[in-house]
Amino acid sequence: MVRKLPLFDGFIETPFELRFQGLLRQAWLQRSWHVIVAEPGSGKTMGIGDLRDEAARQAGMVGGRRYPVLAVTTPKNDPREAALGNLLLGALGVGARGRWSERKYLLYDLLGQYGVECLVCDDAHDLSMPHLIFLKELTDHLFLAFPTHPLGLCLVTAGRGASIPLKDVFDQPETMWMQFRRRLDCLQPYCRVVSHTEGEVRDILIALEQIYRPSFPALNLQQWTGSIYTWLTHPLLDPQKSGRVLMDPLMKLVTTALKWSYAQAEADVTSQHLKAAAELLTLRRDKIQIIDAENNRLKEDEQEKQESGEEQKKPKSKGRKAKELEKQPSSDEPENPSPK
């Protein structure tokens, strides 16, 4: 039976998360608005969930439930404002019953009752025009309520390169987008959170050593920092040549190598397993794996061996001269025998 490594699926406070959560916390405490962009696979969703849970723990349960930081994922392929509103109601634990025209104003009241201080929209690059208009209407209503209830807003997007999602929308000359742009933070309206340097990769590897120490008594990942950094800045994983390492491929490389080493009951990860895991992420990432029953694979292997053996046993084809000699009659037989 193959040994299976117990994997860690919790939150790791990486340098990227410190930078990213710092912006979210600023929006929460100062009620500021930001458009935040980071590369896919950098760990945005994990950071949002951790800060949301931390804010709820700090608020406590005295006086009922409170959600200081309310986070939702932008609805895909549904541009209606009701789609985003239903997700906000669901995050508050309220079912989507009744007409949206009635639940819409119920949502305004619930945001105040549950003490929501900051809205975070993950995958905000998928927001439609009705979604953005609804967010402005929602925040306007709460700001003019009595007592006033200003909300922070973080639109978290995924992107690469120099482009900033949603910026072209807010740069339009219509009054609606001028008002939206005016509410963005004056110092940090658009923020790009970068991933990890080589030194920060070393810090993450040290943290992973502590996490997986019970399974690997002699685990020493930090000695492979240079090699791992080189592998993970391969042009296929870093097409922008930023020299930064994303958390997702880093965790995939390390955990894959640890799984293989653990299956062989090794006390430390081996360089061969690390190199093979790096090749899976780069050179062999587009390889198609054939998944089939074990018996079928064995039968196919046996058939291939039999076919190769039969080909080797086949006599070699004779040349033209040998064939002509076979056709010639022997000296004992007449060339044209007469019929009896």
Language-model features and meaning:
Residues 98-114:
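Conserved alpha-helical scaffold flanking the Walker A/P-loop in AAA+ ATPase domains
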Residues 110-131:
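Conserved P-loop NTPase "ATPase switch" module shared by AAA+ and STAND
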Residues 16-29:
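Pre-Walker A adenine-sensing motif
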Residues 54-64, 94, 143:
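Post-Walker A helix-loop "phosphate-sensing" segment adjacent to the P-loop in P-loop NTPases
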Residues 4-16, 47-55, 67, 77, ...:
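C-terminal alpha-helical "lid" subdomain
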Residues 29-51:
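Walker A/P-loop nucleotide-binding motif
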Residues 69-97:
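Conserved NTP-binding/hydrolysis module of P-loop NTPases
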